[in-house]
């Protein structure tokens, strides 16, 4: 079967790889000059199979009000007269209950664990290198209240069989020795030892090369304009360089997916939540992280990527804008220099990307109401973590094969009739 994938980020490329392995003739179309040049370019570098939590959680509405007045706030809200933004926010608020949080977190952990297995197998069969490390994620707590509040995450990890360790201050330092200089600033942590780190951009580029060797055609520098539907199925995708036809189509355009689907009468509740990162050359390894440290106070991840530190995080709801705010950079700099001052900040690269977020935090993977049109989008902050599992799952769905994990609650249908997820 001929399959056209729209989008060459990590989700589009993993989808292409698995579809090609399944024997399909695959073409990937993207407006950029190569793979992973938008949201997949400089994300935080976490591959956090255990650290999967919905942003929509009990207490978040109250915390959000407090964050609005913080200098280094993890959440920035710039309201617009935008029905899509308002509807998305209302649905997200509806997911901020204990019951919804447990359901959504369980879905995320299921897909993340599947992706862990898929990534390990893919790494074995391809031997690609992407500055990967397998030393876990340390969620770092600066206050006793944060440590106490982590009990709900520990409960969910235990219920889903995800390995974890609750650490005191000294144990945190044994895991991340550079924290010794900041011991007075921390009280403890939660370690998920099976988590990994890696450069998503490097991974996606190398996997694109492997996919090309399997026959995948990458058509870069081609802007997607609209989908053509006739007789209940897609008959082509119109681009600035003509129309591409296929037997099946996969929309993997991240935050831009809803804009392509809306004219077809398909409402995909995905909205861009901007994140920021700094990539800092290491000058003193003894003051740098070994793996990923999640600074719970600022919701910022500090990750070791070879000879660089990647600092990423924050959530800015401001629509489709990639402008770089100086205040956001100061927050990233504050977090990393406070804990790991081993980089040359004068040579840091500042970046932003639009994460495609659903109101419940879980991606949308699978069929639509149009027979040959599929979606693989809405992974939010966990696109890198969930990429291999999502690509493999999508390939099974398109191929009509039995999926290896339950996927009914990952489908777009969970939002039918005004449901919240």
From Swiss-Prot:
It catalyses: a D-alpha-amino acid + A + H2O = a 2-oxocarboxylate + AH2 + NH4(+). Its EC number is 1.4.99.-. SUPFAM superfamilies: FAD-linked reductases, C-terminal domain (SSF54373), FAD/NAD(P)-binding domain (SSF51905). One of its GO terms (biological process) is D-alanine catabolic process. Pathway: Amino-acid degradation; D-alanine degradation; NH(3) and pyruvate from D-alanine: step 1/1. Its cofactor is FAD. GO terms for cellular component: cytoplasm; plasma membrane. It is an enzyme of class 1 (oxidoreductase). It comes from the Bacteria. GO terms for molecular function: D-amino-acid dehydrogenase activity. Keywords: FAD, Flavoprotein, Oxidoreductase. It holds the Pfam family DAO. FAD binds at residues 3-17. Belongs to the DadA oxidoreductase family. Oxidative deamination of D-amino acids. This is D-amino acid dehydrogenase. The lineage of its organism: Bacteria, Pseudomonadati, Pseudomonadota, Alphaproteobacteria, Hyphomicrobiales.
């Amino acid at each position: 079967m001929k399959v056209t994938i729209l989008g060459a980020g990590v989700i589009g490329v993993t989808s292409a790889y698995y579809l090609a392995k399944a024997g399909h003739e695959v073409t990937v179309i993207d407006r950029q000059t190569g793979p992973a040049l938008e949201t997949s370019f400089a994300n935080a570098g976490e591959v956090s199979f255990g650290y999967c939590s919905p942003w929509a959680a009990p207490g978040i509405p109250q915390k959000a009000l407090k964050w609005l007045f913080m200098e280094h706030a993890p959440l920035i809200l710039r309201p617009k007269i935008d029905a899509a933004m308002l509807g998305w926010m209302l649905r997200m608020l509806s997911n901020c209950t204990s019951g919804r949080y447990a359901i959504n977190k369980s879905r995320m952990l299921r897909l993340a664990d599947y992706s862990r297995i898929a990534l390990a197998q893919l790494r074995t069969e391809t031997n690609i290198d992407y500055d990967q490390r397998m030393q876990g994620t340390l969620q770092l707590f600066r206050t006793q209240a944060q440590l106490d509040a982590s009990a709900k995450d520990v409960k969910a990890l235990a219920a889903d069989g995800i390995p974890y360790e609750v650490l005191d201050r000294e144990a945190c330092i044994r895991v991340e020795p550079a924290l010794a200089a900041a011991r007075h600033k921390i009280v403890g942590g939660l370690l998920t030892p099976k988590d990994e780190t890696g450069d998503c951009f490097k991974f996606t580029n190398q996997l694109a090369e492997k996919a090309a060797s399997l026959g995948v055609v990458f058509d870069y520098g081609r802007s997607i304009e609209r989908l053509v539907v006739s007789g209940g199925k897609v008959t082509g995708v119109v681009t600035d360089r003509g129309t591409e036809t296929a037997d099946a189509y996969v929309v993997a355009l991240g935050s831009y997916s809803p804009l392509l689907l809306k004219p077809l009468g398909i409402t995909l509740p995905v909205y861009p939540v901007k994140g920021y990162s700094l990539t800092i050359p290491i000058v003193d390894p003894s003051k740098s992280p070994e793996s990923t440290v999640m600074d719970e106070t600022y919701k910022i991840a500090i990750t070791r990527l070879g000879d660089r530190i990647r600092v990423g995080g924050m959530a800015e709801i401001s629509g489709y804008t990639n402008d770089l705010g100086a205040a956001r950079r100061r927050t990233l700099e504050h977090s990393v220099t406070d804990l790991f001052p081993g980089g040359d900040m004068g040579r840091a690269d500042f970046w932003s990307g639009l994460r495609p977020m659903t109101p419940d935090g879980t991606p949308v993977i699978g069929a639509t109401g149009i027979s040959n049109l599929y979606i693989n989008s809405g992974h939010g902050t966990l696109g890198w973590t969930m990429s291999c599992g999502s690509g493999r799952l999508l390939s099974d769905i398109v191929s009509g094969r039995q999926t290896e994990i339950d996927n009914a609650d990952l489908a777009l249908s969970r939002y039918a009739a005004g449901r919240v997820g």
